[in-house]
Amino acid sequence: MNPERSERIEIPVLPLRDVVVYPHMVIPLFVGREKSIRCLEAAMDHDKKIMLVAQKEASTDEPGINDLFSVGTVASILQMLKLPDATVKVLVEGLQRARISALSDNGDHFTAKAEYLTSPEIEEREQEVLVRTAINQFEGYIKLNKKIPPEVLTSLNSIDDAARLADTVAAHMPLKLSDKQSVLEMSDVDERLEYLMAMMESEIDLLQVEKRIRNRVKKQMEKSQREYYLNEQMKAIQKELGEMDDAPDENEALKRKIDAARMPKEAREKTEAELQKLKMMSPMSAEATVVRGYIDWMVQVPWNARSKVEKDLQKRRQTLDTDHFGLERVKDRILEYLAVQSRVSKIKGPILCLVGPPGVGKTSLGQSIAKATGRKYVRMALGGVRDEAEIRGHRRTYIGSMPGKLIQKMAKVGVKNPLFLLDEIDKMSSDMRGDPASALLEVLDPEQNIAFNDHYLEVDYDLSDVMFVATSNSMNIPAPLLDRMEVIRLSGYTEDEKLNIAKKHLLSKQIERNALKEHELIVDDSAIVGIIRYYTRERGVRSLERELSKLCRKAVKTLLMDKSVKHIEINADNLKDYLGVQRYDYGRADSENRVGQVTGLAWTEVGGDLLTIETACVPGKGKLTYTGSLGEVMQESIQAALTVVRARAEKLGINGDFYEKRDIHVHVPEGATPKDGPSAGIAMCTALVSCLTGNPVRADVAMTGEITLRGQVLPIGGLKEKLLAAHRGGIKTVLIPDENKRDLEEIPENVIADLDIHPVKRIEEVLALALQNAPYGMQVASVK
């Protein structure tokens, strides 16, 4: 039957690859070719109508007139969206078939003269029969083809028009491009439906064959599972009859490993029971993999292997001194342990906790202790650990379970008595998964760690031979955990210690790391001191090492760029040329005695520093003002000092009503830096007395100590850092609380020798030493 012709149209043509669009179809298209994009723009500028025509060959990038089919679909552009990659996404709806009578290419895009194709009318009853037959056949096709959703059949049942039904069925069938194009070119609905039903019949036959093959495979799998089940039953019967075959080679290998591990009785019985269980399992089962993994861990853990511990004290002392300068308390504690160990055959390993700021050598000291004692070294980083299972392990009921990191590290190191470094123990935290700090209580208790129980191993493991060393930046550690460790504080290095560390360790390491030779770079002691004072502000030596590395890099650059330079010498005079402008400064003693100005001593996180305190008295009504970012404790210290002065006003020659007629202003310079603490109490009191009496304060005197309302001087902390700051700043005389005399044992001898240190008990002694003209006429002896 020939199709009926209708009106002629002139319309832009969009070539499509591997896609045939039917009437009533709504489909998104991604357009990337420039010519096609211009075609869409032309359609959008006109009536949003476009003709969609499939290419004969999808591989053709630039199709010509002869590369397109003659029949396509006139469509309406519903939406057009330009994408960031310069392509266009367009949503189109097919309207009606059309045949091209003339196709032209104007350079921008294809334009076609076409005419709509209309289908001849068919009898209504005949159409109903065709629709019903097609739907029934398509329903059978959907049942076999699981790729088409059942909702499609629901939508087909609502279609009464035979032509639209045929197009919808064709759109959902996996037809070749040529077959889809053939359906598009059939304007006769009767012919179109018959063609599609024939294609569906062919597809149904193929799908039925595929289903039979799938059923055969399924039966084969069921047969394999049945055979596996029967094999397991057979093994059980053989076990009852005592007719088990010889164990496979793998089981024999595991048995030999168990014998070689020399496990304690409990661990051996547990491991052998698991091995017997493994023999009864299929090697390919998931449970066998779990059991095999458990046995592997049990034979890897060191149950009896030990490394020989060094007992020669002189040799061990030499090792510690070679690796680290200073740190005498730690070295003495290690040597004490070695001394006792040389006399006692069985001694529990000490549990030390090295507490100190970053960069003072806590972690490297752990390595040095291991080297000195002859133990193997193993480190476990605890920073950020928040799961108890990291310590105790996971129970084997969990998929992918493993022992805790403690047992893993012991298996890795291979001996029972290593030095185990617990790094950053203060950085642990807890959450809903448990508290790892609480799990460590058992590990670090010498009375309990003889029977440490890992959840994965499920047997006791002896940790009493392990030498645990923990490191921490602060004392912010749970009290029960802290109670189990011997805390050794590592304060910041002194200037002399930093100089020696730089000369003996850091500089040579950086010279080697930067491929320099010893004679090519000479760094004078004055340059190293300059770096310590003016380019770093720390209690450790990390920044110092970075600055030395910077010197080495600049030296390498200079040597390579200027061949005439054979070696480089760096001293205090040319240090600025290599490291730039000085970043820091340190407090220095004032050169003149001043009224109302006192030099105090402060402790900071990076060491000690000089603290200047200024006071001024002006006519007023007794207002007390304090500035300089002072904390609450320091403000209260000023008020206490003022009360002490008022109580002694008559003896000091101060008018008794000064607090009513004068305003007093106390200022501590460097106002942007917060300051707090009670240790500036005697300095505040001295400054107030000097201001009110006009008696200057000696510029070469610095002081530290808390004051009470009765005028007593109370002890303070951080004495070592404060005295080092006084020594560095050129102070000659230092006043300290009498109760801090015991702390002078920790001060370097060269610092003690250069300072005139006076322990004081009362404010009267402080004023007698600090003021230019002693108000009481008394003398106070120094500690020398």
From Swiss-Prot:
ATP binds at G356, P357, P358, G359, V360, G361, K362, T363. Residues 592-773 form the Lon proteolytic domain. It catalyses: Hydrolysis of proteins in presence of ATP. Keywords: ATP-binding, Cytoplasm, Hydrolase, Nucleotide-binding, Protease, Serine protease, Stress response. It is found in: Cytoplasm. PANTHER family: ATP DEPENDENT LON PROTEASE FAMILY MEMBER (PTHR10046). This is Lon protease. The gene is lon.
